[in-house]
Amino acid sequence: MIRSTFTAALHCQYGQVGVVDTPLWAHPFFSADQDGWLCTDYKRGDSVSFKPIEFTFTFIEATNGRLHYRINCATGPKFLSGRLEQNSNGWLGLYGYAWGDDLANCIFPPSLLARLPALQDTWKMELLGAWDGDLESAENVEFYLRDKKGHRVAQVEARYSRSSPPLRNWFLHAGNKEGDILRFHLHDIKVE
């Protein structure tokens, strides 16, 4: 696959990958809980909270048949340059994108270290088929996306029990939770 920095939309069998960005008027109590988490078009695309995004893939290295990248949001203004990372429970989201993060960095300077590229999560792309090296055919190559521990990214159901009845949503996850493993491919590739 592409061994340089590029920008592309990330798609899977459930459509385009996007981010939750819920307007306050839509869910005043839960919008802050969900904003920044990654989801798919199929499960959230019909809601006002789904925002399709593109990513910048910064190539790091190729080892053991896998390509390693740092991945950041390339769509703005709110999520521009947000880092694709996972929380301690394995949920995937964009980190370091909001002005509030900048304010927190001023108050707690050690959190500035998290912005250093060397400390950002890396993601492994495992191709599921051969690629002929032609950029135009790269959009047809499927791959798994794995976290630093080797877990494949899946779409997993999350329940919010603070409401009655509980809210059911699906987000991207890499870890031990049961879900549908995603087979990704790229769209609208732009090599830098």
Protein language model regions, located:
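Lectin-like carbohydrate-binding module/patch detector with strong preference for beta-trefoil
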Residues: M1-E192
